[in-house]
Structures are given as C-alpha cells and as structure tokens.
Amino acid sequence: MITTTSQEIELAPTRLPGSQNAARLFVAQTLLQTNRLLTRWARDYITVIGAIVLPILFMVVLNIVLGNLAYVVTHDSGLYSIVPLIALGAAITGSTFVAIDLMRERSFGLLARLWVLPVHRASGLISRILANAIRTLVTTLVMLGTGVVLGFRFRQGLIPSLMWISVPVILGIAIAAMVTTVALYTAQTVVVEGVELVQAIAIFFSTGLVPLNSYPGWIQPFVAHQPVSYAIAAMRGFAMGGPVLSPMIGMLVWTAGICVVCAVPLAIGYRRASTH
C-alpha cells in the first residue's frame, strides 16, 4: 500500500499555488484584451486620423508658421518645442478617442458581458491603461519620425533620447486616467470633449510655443507649473540640453497626483459601468 501511494503521488500532476495561477491568468487575459483593443483602434480610421494624421499636419503647419519666429526668440530650431508639443497633444487627443470608445462599449453592453465571463475583473481596466500607453508610444514615435524629417535631432545621446520618448507615455497615462474617469460617470460624449478642450487650453498656455516671460505676469505661475509645461521643458532638455531634473520631477508629481485622485473613482466607475 505504501508503494502504491508513493507511485500515485509521483504520478499526480504538479499544480501551481492559487495565487500564482491567478497571477498567470491575469497577465494572459490582460495581454489578450490589450491586443483586442489595439486591433480595433488600428482598424478605426477616425481614431487613426485624429490621433496620427492630424497631429502630423499640425506639426508641419506650426513649423512653417512659427518655426522662424521661434528661432528669433530662442536662437535655436523651433522644432525642439514644436515636436514635444505635438507629441503631447497627440497623446491627449488619443486619450479622448479611447474614452469615447469605452463609452461605446458600455452602451453596447460589451462591458457587462465581459464582467460575467470567467475573466479576471481587473484585466479589463488594466488592459485599457496598457493599450493606451502602447498607443501613446506609437504615436510619439510617429511624431518623432515626422520631426526628424523636418530637421529635429537629438544632441544628448541614447539614454536622454529614450527618456524623451517616455515623457508623453508617462503623462499620457495620467491624462487617460482622468478622461476615462469622466467618461465612466457620464453618458454624453460632449462632456468628454469638454475635458479635451480644457486640456487643449493647457497645451497652448504652456512654454511650448512661446517663452514664459512672453506671458502676462498674472498668468505666468499657471503656465510655469502646469504639467504640459513641465513635460515640454523636460523633453527640450533631453533633446538639446538643459535642466531636466526639476521639470521631470514636476511632471512625475503631476502624473502621480492625477492617478491617485482618479484611482478609486476609476475603479468604482468601471465596476458600475460593467454591472449595469
């Protein structure tokens, strides 16, 4: 009997502990849903045009109209401000399209159907954050490629270049969290578009187009300390040289603050949208 028991134990299949198995399923299901979102966004020509084509055209126009003016003011190529500005703008615009897509899935009942399936509950929300980060990365690379064609060049080496690319992705996560939170608590796309308008104002009232001292004194504190200005200053420093520590810390503080504020409402809103 002892021999038989030993043989049975040896032949028994090895199983992962419950926590390890759940973690493995969570990762697999998150990647699967991320791929689903990216595939659908890539096939949506409106999203592609709004998130990639229009920013490219806007960059070309800004370079033609303001490139020489920026050179007169800064004594350097205006592309070192225009390319970061458009990369951040594309990240913000794309986040709005992502939020509207979430509202569409909620209205079609897809979120509710996914909620009752044997799928990790957190994978649906995490996959959207991951998919948006990948989308922002792709958009940033496209904007960078366009800037290189126009004459943009990195002057600080490989590591600062990679840090330059990471800035829109990091800030884009916070922007996506904020816009998605708003989208989960409203059924009107006009509200989400209103949030995009506020973000667009933040883009234009930044140090991306004109230096800080060109603004009226009463608005300079807002312009200097808003997240887009911090991000543009960091990207400019990574590309052509200059201070990067202070603007990078400012951008990271803004990102962390937005994510912390939105974390609980985002989780509650996603659960409510998936169960109603």
From Swiss-Prot:
GO biological process per UniProt: daunorubicin transport; doxorubicin transport; response to antibiotic
Origin superkingdom: Bacteria
Chain ranges of the ABC transmembrane type-2 domain: 46-273
GO CC term (a single one): peptidoglycan-based cell wall
Record bears the keyword Cytoplasm: no
Transmembrane feature ranges: 46-66, 82-102, 129-149, 159-179, 190-210, 248-268
Membrane topology annotation: Multi-pass membrane protein
Principal subcellular localization: membrane
PANTHER family according to UniProt: DOXORUBICIN RESISTANCE ABC TRANSPORTER PERMEASE PROTEIN DRRC-RELATED
Physiological role: Probably part of the ABC transporter complex DrrABC involved in doxorubicin resistance. Probably responsible for the translocation of the substrate across the membrane.
Full protein name: Probable doxorubicin resistance ABC transporter permease protein DrrC
